[in-house]
């Protein structure tokens, strides 16, 4: 086995492990959600359409070219289009996680959200792991406009909410993207737990200090 083949096999196993962890801990249900990562050759490895994150076969993961061509494995999710848009427009993005996790999806369904940044920082980890979290308007799943909107937002952001749909998070590795996704989900949970209680938000100076 070549060095590249060994790296690819390791990444396949990592994807199935992380996906299974999401499923086992309740972040994903049924066949909802999808993950992807960039391979060293520039191709994309992604979870197949209709697949359960808790029961993936490393050898059946979808391999997709940078132009969207399906190369091998099972058929990719139609949502791979917006994964590709993120990779093309943010060179730091090496992996993408999209889930329908309970708290973040609930947050995406609320009216009156600030579309430029859904989560006003109230913990340091919001700033350190996510930064701003812009809201993409509702479109039917698979609609090309999701990819178009994410492409416009990708350069300056790494976490997003799709309205009435769920979260999308990037990372410089699949593990980092997974960690960022969990931080977003836990932050959304805190928002609902706090409810209408007065929140002590971070000041502009405190946010600047975290970003420095």
Spans of features found by a protein language model:
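Glycine-rich flexible loops
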Residues: 1-212
